[in-house]
């Protein structure tokens, strides 16, 4: 993997994400536009996946040449729908349930990866729906820095799992998603530290339903795609632990913990997300047998070029 390809595939999507996130979260006049701040992160994540894929694998075709090429196509749909979902933010529990059910059903129907039967697609759809319910609820209660830092950690971990699975394109895509989420974290942190509202209080940025919708869709999608093409030491339990990590933010709302505020409490909640991530990475990197790496790589390449 050349440095130039690495910079292009991760750097360009990150730049696109910065162009979308920074003005929407840091420029007051732009931030006040309805639905813009709440969709910026979601649109940026979707665009990051599409741009990273195109930099490494070219423009996806319709119908896709390989099953996993549905990822950028689904991401395009996420980009289009994020502003709509963001405008629905605050519509109440009915709106939340409708988005959860619809997003889970559509993604479970469209994403057909190798080794995925009907039960697997149902599980993916349920995972997407539950993730949206959790992240959309948490996004109303917690700072943007909490969720964006959590997503940065999760996408970074998924990139490492893909690297160990010899899935280079998805490694770069997850790296681009991690970098874009990192831009969101930096922007949310800057907004909170350096900006004030009319009463002189620190202004917190929320990722909104648009950001929650994109994150709840892309994390399970990337996990299932990585699992479907995994041969070797990276197993379903590792993908499951990392993919379920954002849901750990829900435990930060338990009685006795939910009343804690401030930057320290935000990082404590991020620590909850780190627990399953750390367990998964420790299990992977302590169980890797270098003698099996070549066999896994060859099988993976055969799967890719067979159009699966």
Show which residues each predicted segment covers.
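Membrane-interfacial segments
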Residues: 194-199, 232, 288-292
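Short alpha-helical packing/oligomerization segments
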Residues: 225-250
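N-terminal topogenic module of multi-pass integral membrane proteins
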Residues: 1-141, 252-268, 272-308
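Generic multipass alpha-helical transmembrane bundles of integral membrane proteins
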Residues: 97-228
